[in-house]
Amino acid sequence: MKNTVPALVCLLLAACGGGGGGGSSTPATGTTSPTSPTSPTSPTTPTTPVGTSYKVAGLVVGLEASGLVVANNTTDTVTVAKGATSFVFGTQVASGGAYSVTFPSQPGGFQSCSITGATSGTVSADVSLPVICTDAVVSVSTLAGSDTAGYADGTGSAARFGGDPTLAVSGTRLAGLTLDTAGNVYVADSLNSRIRKITTAGIVTTFAGSGVFGSTNGTAATATFSTPAAMVFDAAGNMFVTDTQAHNVRKIATDGTVTTFAGSGIYSSVDGTGIQASFRAPSGIVIDTAGNLYVGDAEAHVIRKITAAGVVTTFAGTTNVAGSADGTGTAASFNDPAGLAIDAAGNLFVADAKNNKIRKITPAGVVTTYAGSGAAGKDDSTTATAATFNVPVNLSIDSDGFLYVADTNSARIRKISPSGKVTTVAGGGIGTDTANAGKDASFVGPTSVVFDKSKTLYVADGNKVRKLVRN
């Protein structure tokens, strides 16, 4: 028998890949050779996936009015609601694409919004722009009238208001303003005993009153007034006028007929219906959505309410008692309440002239102090009741709840924001009449303000009606 063991061992060693230096250098079938490790690759900047796009947005501070519209690249627009703190454009911008943000429409409330920093650029990530809303600079011009008192219809500075220029006047020559639905301005030309009408083009005509001092009813051309102070239209287009020295409230119907709506003409403060009631120098007047009139019965120191049927009651204040107490109804007190404004919720705002305050009355008759510390002054403040006024006599409110105040003795137009911030819109307080921007403008002594739907504020000042618009 042949010796087969060495051959078998050799075969097994070969099958296991073993063997010394004398073994085969070729691996057996089914085995792999070890490989050297690969070197790490150098890091690279990540590439943007094809089709990536980014948001363009804004963070908003201080927006208290409606009407702000922002646009990206002209066509992508967003209307930003008042009180909003952010917005996002609907169309994203592709990576590397351009954005350019503009403001096609600024908000109401004489606010102005702008971007802090760059307004345009290219995108490589989401963009968030800081939008800051502050008080706008306004321009002041004259719509109608001149420095010379008189009486003349005409256009712009050719018109005359204010009566006899030789007459020594301790009070105002022009009083209240109101607007009709077409945007025409009406002014109580007190010392001419007339109601005047001014179109938006500045054309002045006489709306009612013969110019004779009195309280005779009749047609618009023949009726007489005694220092008319303020006016308001009802939904049907009838005008109601507080006829201060006649101590009554007059009505001018749409056909021009003038009648006495409420008040006996006796200097008193008695509730009643129609001419059975009486007033003491009625001043401001507004109307609510139900057709009720509210009157600042200045020298009786109360606010009166007149229903559409002519029923007169005392709504707030203590009759014939001057004071500044807050409270409900007749528990409250005023001191020469003059101009009034009313908001969409039916809250009344009162220019409490001799208290140097703005008061608020809820529909339930609850009276509080809305603005003013009571001290005479011209100080603005972020806290309404810390601000000071100097004989505020008239108010107007816009759709966003901003109040505008004719602060007569400070010769300024003031603004109270819904958050209670009091600022000066226009007027340097130097008691002259110049047409400039904002606080560089000056007034003789503004006596009335009214804000229209196009965001224009009209002011009765001296023998002129002035116009304030955003720069």
Per-segment meaning from a language model:
Residues 184-186, 238-240, 292-294, 347-349, ...:
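Conserved beta-propeller blade signature
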Residues 445-471:
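Blade-level signature of beta-propeller repeat domains, shared across WD40, Kelch, NHL, RCC1
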Residues 190, 244, 298, 353, ...:
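Short loop/turn segments immediately following the C-termini of beta-strands
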Residues 193-197, 203, 247-251, 257, ...:
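A short loop-to-beta-strand structural motif that recurs across blades of beta-propeller domains
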Residues 2-58, 134-135:
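Bacterial Sec-dependent N-terminal signal peptides
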Residues 137-174, 203-227, 257-283, 311-336, ...:
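Gly/Pro-rich loop segments of beta-rich domains
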Residues 59, 86-120:
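Surface-exposed interfaces of beta-sheet-rich extracellular modules
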Residues 179-182, 233-236, 287-290, 342-345, ...:
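Residue-level detector of Asp-centered blade-edge/turn motifs that repeat once per structural unit
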